[in-house]
Amino acid sequence: MTQSQGQDPRLDTSRTIRAPHGTTLRAKSWLTEAPLRMLMNNLDPDVAEHPHALVVYGGIGRAARNWACFDKIVEVLERLEDDQTLLVQSGKPVGVFPTHKNAPRVLIANSNLVPHWANWEHFNELDKQGLMMYGQMTAGSWIYIGSQGIVQGTYETFVAVAKKHFAGEAKGRWVLTGGLGGMGGAQPLAATMAGFSMIAVECDESRIDYRLRTGYVDKKATTLEEALAIVKESDTPVSVGLLGNAADVFAELVERNITPDVVTDQTSAHDPLNGYLPQGWSMAYAAEMRQQDESTVVKAAKQSMAVQVKAMLELQSRGAATLDYGNNIRQMALEEGVENAFDFPGFVPAYIRPLFCEGIGPFRWAALSGDPEDIYKTDQKVKELIPDNPHLHNWLDMARERIQFQGLPARICWVGLKDRERLGQAFNEMVKNGELKAPIVIGRDHLDSGSVASPNRETEGMMDGSDAVSDWPLLNALLNTAGGATWVSLHHGGGVGMGFSQHSGMVICCDGTEDASARIARVLHNDPATGVMRHADAGYDIAKQCAAQQGLDLPMLNEELSKLK
């Protein structure tokens, strides 16, 4: 595509991208059709936050560096052979090389910077020059499935909050949060599924309206008084999207001596330039200032974050169960002088880490056919293969009833080391015998047990102090490449922003072949096993027990593990 001089090559309002459905291939095999469809699915207007700008979610998390790069990626995937591998560097296709049929068809590296230069200032300079792209986690790795992708993890967190703080009873209680973007938009539905009501503050009215249309939020309010009244008057859990600035609303609740039961936040605070609206600013003024004076925007945003975090700390002191939901807002506040910003915990060490110790995390799959029936059939297969987990069955039932598909039908389902390979093999067999209309792709969030180093989120407070060691996601990516995942990605800065995380992703295509079965056996065992390994190495007993039960070979721990079998 040609761009007129001065036009942003990342913006094209004339295009609407949707993944092909059905069994007619544009590429030469399903192994290359799969990444093609999932790339396009990431930019489906029913999936992406700002598809015309290639932005999928998370501030400026993109699927491709610019539209010329997108077009070239599509062109290459359509011609790629099953013994070739495409290399993608920060959203730009840079090479096609000979490999072999069991190698990944695509290898992706996004947003990676040498540590000394791993900050937003340097990234933004490279981004403006067209030399880099922010891939977030599943945006640049082509496995975003809309807000459903984080619903179950958020649901599991809220269930854990209820168990820990309210004896398992969420009825009559409410959650305060901020942000209704691609990730934050999952919060209202997850909260009501877990039995809580919620007020979610969002400064962009179009995002509230979108969550209303897709069933993720129940009501809209334009004043705090209206939102509080909706929650108070409802006999059942209800979610409210409140139009406003999170810092303003959180501070107003403190001033009015109104204390929610639970307080958290999922604004895009990880990116102070693009992801957080300063107090007193309109959306239009912020957009204008981003073009004129980036440093002023960043400073104003971080000052507002400090106000919000101070309010969260005060609400915590008044009895609210307060948690950071992984957007690095505590770090931003700390940099603005809020010395006790980390006095409330992150959600992973507080509620999720025991799951990670067993390799349990956000396993997800999508139906390349585009037919919802393929997902419903896989839902049933999960129940058949895991019959003794009523909590999981309840999740699948709620998901079918309450979650609208965005783009290609997909499902998120938190399972671990002992189940992922079994499910993958079953799905592959369903493709082989014609139960499913087309292949399934299986992937996950980079927020998983063995695929991320993020000291302010997934690896916060590791018991051996290894929070910042990022060898683990690198090893995870290398092992998934060696095992034959269909595409593998290695990113920096997802979730918490530049300089604060490194993480890897994988996707594998179940095309019904024996070769796929062999790859599934390797990848869907090894991938969660690296999470068990990482946590066992850090000293977690749950992980050691799991490693022993699953027969992992961990040389420095084998003697200890042998006593646990």
Swiss-Prot record:
Gene3D superfamilies: Urocanase like domains, Urocanase superfamily
Family matches, as PROSITE patterns: UROCANASE (PS01233)
Predominant location category: cytoplasm
InterPro entries to which the protein is assigned, alphabetical: Urocanase, Urocanase-like, Urocanase_C, Urocanase_central_sf, Urocanase_CS, Urocanase_N, Urocanase_Rossmann-like, Urocanase_sf
Residues noted as binding NAD(+) in the record, renumbered to the chain: 58-59, 136, 182-184, 202, 207, 245-246, 266-270, 276-277, 325, 495
Cell compartment(s), UniProt: Cytoplasm
Similarity remark: Belongs to the urocanase family.
Record-given protein name: Urocanate hydratase
Gene field: hutU
